[in-house]
């Protein structure tokens, strides 16, 4: 059943059931008072519970952060966050923003009315999908409905064959009748998705022209422009998603930019998109579906940045929040990009996206016993209402947070003392739900909860590393999010990862990622030819045409020519296969031997086999058009003595490999200078996270205030 379409509201960007009770809370750290002439960069990441703000002083490299509750209208939360950071809008040189607005709109199906016009006989392509299921064996599990109900999918007589020959032109009488229906229904957003239009867009363009004649104010998206690729389900669904999100993202971006400029901001509002770049509010109106993975991309970008500052080109990102954990991989300084992703299974969005695996493992994930009597952890979550049992807001089922606070790894206060945790309630829930049914002591039950959570995350890391041909032993683990640093060392031990890195501000690291990106557009075009018979002159001409389109898009976003950069990629596959791999190529291709060599090498790594003697074909070409921004640079601090400052206290903590609790020193991270070394066992607390340093581990603060923990490998 499809939710009824209605007028857009930014209330849809936030699940109001998850609004926190502590509406008055504003969390600040390290106030930054800018003087006249100084400018700052501000990044904002809107989550379901909190809006995180990261502020970088361009002159000193100093960073400070702020948190405010996410509001019903997310724009209010953004402006509240900037205010909480003590930053004036006219001091902001650059503002970038990651948002779940588009993601939530697709999940809830709350967007303005829209229609799809397609080839007669293909009305149900986006509902039939590929015939696969998220859970193959659960035949009773309902699939999510398409973004447009059947009554909102209209058809017209037309046909183009596989080679691009127009067999039947658009029936003009039918087309004008459809225009009459659309006008009568007051629809202003239409997706035109014709079969084989990726190879010849003539009929789609004619249908668009007729609609514009009959309804001058209508907004039309053509599948041949949005995603000119084969496979109609993927192309149709991407175009439909882009159409329904365009007014949502466009209105949001325009209003946010307007309110900020009214307050004195003079620049563009930059919105983070799935590919790891940003687009202006104008660009978001045209390619809104790229915002559907806005939030998770920021964490992956920041993780790579932190790892490279610490001296690691290979890194695995562990972004553990309250409900979920996002995991990504960076090899040789490059994040992995995928074209195969979705917000909900069965409805692909084919814009390039940073490859991030999300699992239901967070601080609020529930521990429970399944029908077979096994201990499970997540994906169910306590959310922010009622939250973990220890929050004393009505929660009854134990969570990872409850286990951590009971074992002493978390203190009794969070968020700078504004949230008090009830350890007794956590213990009772652990005993009732896990301890008694499994015959475990309360401490062993709490340890078991965390071990299952760690096992779930370790399995996810294996999927993004070992499954792709990468050995975790060659990587650093970057642990962040509110809960990542609690589990980082335990996870590294399970996976034999040699080092764990914790950013200076783990809880707002995703917001930092928004400061590290360029304006990017990804253009694709089908180009099917055997490598041996490819016309290189024609191939280069196609690339130049795509680069010119990219140049026009960047110019539309006010990017100067000297700040434009273009990269070319060829998607290759073995003849007869349909899965392909994207291979970078030089600006002017003189031959394809090196590209073919790279293809065989990458195919062997990712799929564990290659066939150097088999014929290879090109199936698609891509251009990434980039408008370069000045990157954020963190302040570099001189290294001081290894001796850390005195701990602020102690408490008994139970660690994984110890048989009893150890009286453990507690450190305030704000007091740890560059060069300081903290010997485990220890717990390091800060405003937005807590770091567990088990016995035998040393936490060292580097010149960028990144904490590095070497993890000895077991024999």
Region locations from a protein language model:
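Active-site phosphate-binding/coordination module
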Residues: 113-165, 223-227, 513
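N-terminal glycine/serine-rich phosphate-binding loop of ATP-dependent small-molecule kinases
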Residues: 6, 19, 24-114, 168, ...
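Short glycine-rich, Thr/Ser-proximal phosphate-binding strand/loop in the N-terminal lobe
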Residues: 44-74, 144-163, 420, 523-530
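ATP-dependent carbohydrate kinase catalytic cores
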Residues: 75, 79, 84-85, 224-231, ...
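Glycine-rich phosphate-binding loop of actin/hexokinase-like ATP-binding domains
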Residues: 63-70, 115-121, 141-143, 281-282, ...
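Gly-rich Lys/Arg/Thr-decorated short loops/hinges at beta-loop-alpha junctions or inter-strand turns
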Residues: 55-64, 132-137, 147-166, 187, ...
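Terminal amphipathic helices with adjacent charged low-complexity linkers/tails
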Residues: 193-239, 623-641, 702, 707-713
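C-terminal, non-catalytic interaction/recognition modules in large multi-subunit enzymes and RNPs
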Residues: 38, 46, 173-177, 181, ...
């Amino acid at each position: 059943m499809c939710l009824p379409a209605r007028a857009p509201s930014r209330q849809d960007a936030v699940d109001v059931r998850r609004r926190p009770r502590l509406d008055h809370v504003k969390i600040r750290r390290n106030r930054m008072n800018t003087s006249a002439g100084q400018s700052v960069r501000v990044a904002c990441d809107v989550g379901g519970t909190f809006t995180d703000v990261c502020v970088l002083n361009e002159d000193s490299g100093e960073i400070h952060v702020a948190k405010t509750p996410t509001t019903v209208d997310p724009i209010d939360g953004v402006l509240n966050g900037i205010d909480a950071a003590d930053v004036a809008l006219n001091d902001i040189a650059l503002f970038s923003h990651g948002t779940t607005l588009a993601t939530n709109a697709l999940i809830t199906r709350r967007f303005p009315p829209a229609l799809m016009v397609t080839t007669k006989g293909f009305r149900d392509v986006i509902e039939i999908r590929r015939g696969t299921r998220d859970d193959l064996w659960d035949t009773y599990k309902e699939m999510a409905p398409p973004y447009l109900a059947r009554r909102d999918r209209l058809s017209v007589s037309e046909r183009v064959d596989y080679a691009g020959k127009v067999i039947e032109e658009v029936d003009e009488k039918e087309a004008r009748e459809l225009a009459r229906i659309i006008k009568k229904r007051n629809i202003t957003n239409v997706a035109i998705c014709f079969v084989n239009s990726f190879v010849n867009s003539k009929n789609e363009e004619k249908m668009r022209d007729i609609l514009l004649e009959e309804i001058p104010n209508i907004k039309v998206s053509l599948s041949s422009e949005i995603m000119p690729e084969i496979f109609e389900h993927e192309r149709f669904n991407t175009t439909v998603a882009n159409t329904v999100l365009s007014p949502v993202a466009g209105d949001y971006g325009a209003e946010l930019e307007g309110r900020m400029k009214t307050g004195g901001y003079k620049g563009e509002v930059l919105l983070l998109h799935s590919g790891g770049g940003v687009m202006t509010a104008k660009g978001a109106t045209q390619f809104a579906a790229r915002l559907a993975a806005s939030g998770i991309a920021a964490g992956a970008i920041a993780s790579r940045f932190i790892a490279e500052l610490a001296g690691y080109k290979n890194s695995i990102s562990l972004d553990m929040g309250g409900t979920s954990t996002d995991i990504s991989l960076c090899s040789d300084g490059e994040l992995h990009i995928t074209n195969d992703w979705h917000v909900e299974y069965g409805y692909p969005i084919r814009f390039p996206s940073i490859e991030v695996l999300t699992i239901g493992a967070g601080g609020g994930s529930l521990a429970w016993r399944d029908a077979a009597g096994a201990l499970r952890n997540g994906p169910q979550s306590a959310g922010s209402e009622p939250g973990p049992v220890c929050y004393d807001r009505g929660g009854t089922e134990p969570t990872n947070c409850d286990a951590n606070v009971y074992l002493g790894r978390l203190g009794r206060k969070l968020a700078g003392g504004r949230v008090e945790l009830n350890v007794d309630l956590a213990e009772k829930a652990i005993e009732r739900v896990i301890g008694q049914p499994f015959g475990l002591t309360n401490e062993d039950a709490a340890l078991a909860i965390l071990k299952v959570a760690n096992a779930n995350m370790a399995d996810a890391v294996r999927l993004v590393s070992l499954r792709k041909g990468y050995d975790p032993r060659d990587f650093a683990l970057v642990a962040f999010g509110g809960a990542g640093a609690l589990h980082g060392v335990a996870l590294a031990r399970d996976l034999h990862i040699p080092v764990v890195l914790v950013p200076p501000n783990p809880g707002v690291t995703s917001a930092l990622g928004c400061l590290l990106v360029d304006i990017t557009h990804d253009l694709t075009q089908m180009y099917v030819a055997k490598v041996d018979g490819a016309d290189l002159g024609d191939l280069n001409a196609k690339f130049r045409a795509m680069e010119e389109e990219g140049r026009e898009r960047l110019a539309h976003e006010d990017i100067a020519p000297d700040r434009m950069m273009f990269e070319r990629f060829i998607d290759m596959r073995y003849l007869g296969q349909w899965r392909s791999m994207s291979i970078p190529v030089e600006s002017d291709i003189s031959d394809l031997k090196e590209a073919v060599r790279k293809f065989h090498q990458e195919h062997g790594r990712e799929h564990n086999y290659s066939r150097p003697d088999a014929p290879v074909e090109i199936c698609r070409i891509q251009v990434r058009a980039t408008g370069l921004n000045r990157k954020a640079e963190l302040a570099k601090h001189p290294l001081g003595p290894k001796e850390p400052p005195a701990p602020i206290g102690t408490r008994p903590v139970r660690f994984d490999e110890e048989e009893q609790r150890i009286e453990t020193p507690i450190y305030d991270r704000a007091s740890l200078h560059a060069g300081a070394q903290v010997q485990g066992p220890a717990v390091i607390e800060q405003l937005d996270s807590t770091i567990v340093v088990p016995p035998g581990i040393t936490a060292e603060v580097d010149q960028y205030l990144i904490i590095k923990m070497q993890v000895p490998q077991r024999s």
